[in-house]
A protein has these predicted regions:
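Membrane-embedded alpha-helical segments of transport systems
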Residues: 68, 103-122, 139-148
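Juxtamembrane and boundary regions of transmembrane helices in multi-pass small-molecule transporters
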Residues: 123, 133-167
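Membrane-embedded alpha-helical segments and adjacent helix-loop junctions characteristic
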Residues: 2-89
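Interfacial loop-to-helix junctions that mark the boundaries of transmembrane helices
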Residues: 10-17, 132-140
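Alpha-helical transmembrane segments and their lipid-water interface positions
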Residues: 20, 26, 73-77, 111, ...
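Alpha-helical transmembrane segments of multi-pass membrane proteins
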Residues: 23, 55-69, 93-110, 134
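Conserved small/polar residues in nucleotide/adenosyl-binding loops
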Residues: 168-175
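Juxtamembrane helix-boundary/capping and inter-helix hinge elements in multi-pass membrane proteins
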Residues: 37, 85, 89-98, 126-129
Length: 175
């Protein structure tokens, strides 16, 4: 039978871990990125990289999710920031709502694997597993998930003509 004192002491020891000190700092970094507009700049950079491909805006969303995950470590912060930025822009570009939401939610989910993932840090501390090894184990699957999403978006863009509108074509009509 567990007594309250043992549970409290175990919880206190768990919170004293040096690895857990990273959690609030990554959350704060994600907050600062969202408030300073850095996420929007990351998005514009990703858009410039992949806008020439069919479905480029969806690809830019996934690319931004991966980059933001690699900086903030929080999949929830990635999904919330990207939903504010990407979904309105996807509506302008005639993406179906179900596809926009799916791309943003899936892109945010990639953040669970891309280091420095807060989930991996907490799991490593709780199970006394090497966090460095967990990070190394998460990189390849996270990038493969992003690649799989790229392929799905490109296939969808080849089947739905409205998704194939190029970024440069849209910019020409805005001016």
């Amino acid at each position: 039978m567990l007594n309250v004192e043992t549970v409290g002491l175990s919880f206190f020891n768990f919170l004293q871990s040096y690895s857990l000190m990273a959690v609030p700092l990554f959350i704060f970094a994600g907050f600062l990125m969202e408030r300073t507009g850095m996420v929007r700049q990351l998005f514009q950079f990703a858009e410039a990289l992949v806008s020439w491909i069919r479905g480029g805006f969806g690809l830019a969303t996934v690319t931004t999710c991966v980059m933001f995950s690699a900086i903030s470590g929080s999949s929830v912060a990635v999904a919330s920031a990207m939903s504010l930025i990407a979904i309105p822009e996807m509506r302008k570009r005639k993406y179906p709502d179900w596809m926009s939401a799916g791309i943003v939610a899936s892109g945010g989910g990639i953040g669970l694997l891309i280091p420095p993932s807060l989930s991996l840090i907490i799991y490593g501390v709780a199970t006394e597993t090497s966090i460095v090894r967990l990070f190394m184990a998460g990189v390849i699957p996270g990038l493969l998930l992003a690649l799989g999403m790229y392929i799905i978006i490109i296939i969808a863009a080849s089947r739905v003509p409205s998704l194939a509108v190029s970024y440069t074509h849209l910019r020409a009509h805005e001016t």
